[in-house]
Amino acid sequence: MSIEEQQSPITSTQQGLVLGRQKNGVLMFNGIPYAEPPVGDRRFKRPVSPASWDDIRDATRFGPAAPQLPSGGMTDSVPVSWNEDCLFLNVCTPAIDQKKRPVLVWIHGGAYRSGQGAVPWYNGASFALNGDIVVVSINYRLGALGFTDLSRFGDDYATSGINGICDQIKALEWVRDNISGFGGDPSKVTIAGESA
């Protein structure tokens, strides 16, 4: 990969091309949608795969985190907006090549009420650089949007009480289907997290 390609790396996902950035010796792709926005008719429903895009998608900035009550911690001060359209993930990789590195998917904690994948200690740069692995961090629906049981309103809401967990599963499916484009091996995925 040339210096120019390292500064503005582009790779492919099933939905289309994404543009990342180089920072501190690793390649970062942030704010990649792994599901359709859970808004409007999709609110309180199981996540579905995202639609494709034609242009190169800018993946140089983190996507919004799920709406949440301020927790008084560092997640309140990270410069990422909160929005119901929050089903984004971030990929940090040493290189885009055919090496097939192990993958670590980090799921943030916060008692299912707060948190986000954009906090600095979740970005994975140190692991990617020093451990030669690909690191993925995710956002998922929190609080009432992710864990309110509305199943009594019909089959469309059958998963409403566990949609935050369904979001995590959808993110793992995205990793399985797309991580090879980021130098990762979909058969070597480790899931980790804390709290929640």
Model-derived regions: residue spans:
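A ubiquitous, low-specificity "background" feature that marks scattered single residues
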Residues: V91, I96, E173, G184-P186
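Alpha/beta-hydrolase fold nucleophile elbow
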Residues: P102, V175, F182-E194
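A general structural signal for stabilizing positions within well-ordered secondary structure
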Residues: F127, S180-G183
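Active-site loop->helix "elbow" adjoining a glycine-rich segment at hydrolase catalytic centers
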Residues: G109, N163-D167, S195-A196
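Non-catalytic accessory segments of hydrolases
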Residues: M1-I162
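Short, solvent-exposed turn/loop segments enriched in Gly/Ser/Thr/Pro and often Arg
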Residues: R141-A144, A192-A196
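Alpha/beta-hydrolase active-site loop
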Residues: C86, A158-G181
